[in-house]
């Protein structure tokens, strides 16, 4: 009873803190950057991380196994992944735009887990025989961490596309790979006091320069986070194959979950390949990552909605004993 009460308290505290973090972030978007508000935002995400960590540890102690056995627990772990991804650049003293996606993703994920799922799915249960393995921690944790990283990176790519196409900016050209194609330029006339000759000088407006810097940062962080997520996904798939061979006698069965995991891996492998081509970067590679965003959700929720296949124990459908 104590563990359940503590879990309930930590769930509501973490949800409340991340809600406040989003509010603070909206304020920083409406006004000029304020150091105090920025620090409060970062401290809020750290507090959220600690609360969710306490929630997972409490559930682990109560259930006796790593809390990754059903959809509710995986969503909480996914929310935890968003918070830890957000803190990585913070401890390196790098200001970034990850909070644009990590905080909303954390509150959406945790909100859906606590309010969108049936109450019965919140309860810890004895692991089914297929999950009673040491590979549970390795495989499932790597997969959920990869989902978190790939979702964050994909959302950054979506933000890049929105800014690029809305403002009609083409920042990656074929000639020097970093060409500003359609920035707005202001024409300023000034008088040379010595020669009294009028000269027309074109200069890059400060607003567009900031937008250009923002796009570069989004592209850079998207690439970094997706690369990290791709590593996690690869480890998760390989460990899952070994686990499948031990449990079912085959490394690969083309189960719906396995199939979509392979499709997800292929999409982001294509994305990383496009990054090696200097003529196919920026908005072009961001389109591939945006497609990957949809594929991830199909992979993560598709099997759960269908309730079929070898991974059906994590579905929305609750089977009666």
From Swiss-Prot:
Keywords: Chloroplast, Cytochrome c-type biogenesis, Membrane, Plastid, Thylakoid, Transmembrane, Transmembrane helix. It comes from Buxus microphylla (Littleleaf boxwood). One of its GO terms (biological process) is cytochrome complex assembly. Its main location: plastid. The gene is ccsA. May interact with Ccs1. HAMAP family: CytC_CcsA (MF_01391). The chain crosses the membrane at residues 17-37, 44-64, 71-91, 98-118, 143-163, 225-245, 258-275, 286-306. Belongs to the CcmF/CycK/Ccl1/NrfE/CcsA family. One of its GO terms (molecular function) is heme binding. Required during biogenesis of c-type cytochromes (cytochrome c6 and cytochrome f) at the step of heme attachment. It is found in: Plastid, Chloroplast thylakoid membrane. This is Cytochrome c biogenesis protein CcsA. It is a multi-pass membrane protein. Signal peptide: none annotated. One of its GO terms (cellular component) is chloroplast thylakoid membrane.
């Amino acid at each position: 009873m104590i563990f359940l009460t503590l879990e309930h308290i930590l769930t509501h505290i973490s949800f409340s803190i991340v809600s406040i973090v989003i509010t603070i972030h909206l304020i920083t978007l409406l006004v000029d950057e304020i150091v105090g508000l920025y620090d409060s935002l970062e401290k809020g995400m750290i507090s959220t991380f600690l609360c969710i960590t306490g929630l997972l540890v409490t559930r682990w102690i109560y259930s006796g196994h790593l809390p990754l056995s059903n959809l509710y627990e995986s969503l909480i772990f996914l929310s935890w992944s968003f918070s830890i991804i957000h803190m990585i650049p913070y401890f390196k003293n790098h200001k970034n735009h990850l909070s644009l996606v990590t905080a909303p993703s954390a509150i959406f994920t945790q909100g859906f887990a606590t309010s969108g799922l049936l109450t019965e799915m919140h309860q810890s249960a004895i692991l089914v025989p297929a999950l009673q393995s040491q590979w549970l921690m390795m495989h499932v944790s790597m997969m959920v961490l990869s989902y978190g990283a790939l979702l964050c990176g994909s959302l950054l790519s979506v933000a890049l596309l929105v800014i690029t196409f809305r403002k009609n900016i083409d920042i990656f050209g074929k000639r020097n790979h970093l060409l500003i194609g359609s920035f707005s330029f202001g024409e300023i006339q000034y008088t040379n006091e010595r020669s009294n000759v009028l000269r027309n000088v074109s200069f890059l407006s400060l607003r567009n320069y900031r937008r250009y810097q923002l796009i570069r940062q989004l592209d850079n962080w998207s690439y970094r986070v997706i690369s990290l997520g791709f590593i996690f996904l690869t480890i998760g798939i390989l460990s899952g194959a070994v686990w499948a061979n031990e449990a079912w006698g085959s490394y690969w069965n083309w189960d719906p979950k396995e199939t979509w995991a392979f499709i997800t891996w292929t999409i982001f492998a294509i994305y990383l390949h496009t990054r090696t081509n200097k003529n196919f970067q920026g908005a072009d590679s961001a389109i591939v990552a945006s497609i990957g965003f949809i594929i991830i959700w199909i992979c993560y929720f598709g099997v759960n909605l269908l309730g079929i296949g070898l991974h059906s124990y994590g579905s929305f459908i609750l089977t009666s004993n």
